[in-house]
Amino acid sequence: LPPANGGLQFFYGNQVITNFYNAKTNEYYWDTMTVPDIDLMKDPVFVIFDTDAYYNSTSGGDGSGQVTAPPKKYIIPTSGLMAGTVDDYSENSYNVYADIDQLKAMLKKIFKGKAIPGQPTNKAGKPYKEIYYDQVYVKVDSMENVQEIQKVIQDMGYGASSNAEWM
């Protein structure tokens, strides 16, 4: 996994590459069944965090009549790739991982003074200092422990569900 002290880095699942598309042809992997010619370990990967600004800049604005400037692109180094080909599925194949503290620091820097997309604001529209979550996933070491852990989470006042309920 990405090191905690190495700045923001991404670790890519082996099937993430299938979500890239060719901007010139507007085709994805699933359109052509050809893996994009991208080496995630060597090629620079540009990331746009301010997706609202991106879509506003590509669609002619936000409806106010003003042209929206394209948002800044960031090059995020790759710390590693999950083993496997695009045909090897696992529950983590389409995920991108990062050190959560490094990611939060980067988001706070990028959106300084503004709300990070998806985050709540106070009555004045100002962002809170903390990051809020509306969902977490808890992995349990053994099926025998799922109900106990689920009950502990529910006793803390949170909703909790598991696939074990369906078995």
What residue ranges belong to the model's regions?
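N-terminal membrane-entry
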Residues: 165-167
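Basic-flanked hydrophobic alpha-helices used for secretion and membrane insertion
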Residues: 1-161
